[in-house]
Amino acid sequence: MPRNYTTQEKIDQEFGFLVKDKDNHEHYGKILQQDRENIHTQVGVVLPGSYELSRIELVEGNFAIVLLDHSSERIAYYVKASVWKDVVLNASPVTQVLLWRTNDVRHEMVTTGLARSIFFKYLLESYNVVASDSHQTAEGREFWTRQTGFALATDLYVYRYHRIDCTLIKITDHAIIRDNSCDLWGDNEDYCNVLAIISKEAITI
């Protein structure tokens, strides 16, 4: 899977507008001015009355899934996703390029389990193939380790895909993902080209 993303300054830049309370509140206000598609039914979650789970379209074909709390006027959960065409896979995978959840315990009951529901019930159902990002934090790596395990347990397809070599290796044993003996993660630049793939259907190249 991707190159390990360990530079704290870069991580702070990615998540800064969500982590800082003032910036979070300001971004919440900006989202209210945008067109939003409520997706809580597709995701299969029941939300308390003050919460809204919506999709908003971004530039260059990207989109975001946001959990808004209208009581506190804050963003409680944010996923930025990108859809890209891959001619080798003959598919258009969706990739979560940013995933953030508030650590404010007031939202914990609502956000717990939301990541998996969005991943499998919305992203995978909508696009059939979900691919990892090219860089990941330690938390992102842990997230993908869990999701691949869930995918294998529910008879979905998991692969290691190298975008330059055009190699696709099917993975059936979650243990080799947990200990990384399948070589999904690493520190050198080439790991930017290594992706984990979860698919609803078998992929052949």
Residues covered by each model-derived region:
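Non-catalytic substrate-recognition and accessory regions of acyl/acetyltransferase enzymes
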Residues: 1-110, 121-205
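Contiguous hydrophobic, core-forming segments of folded domains
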Residues: 115-116
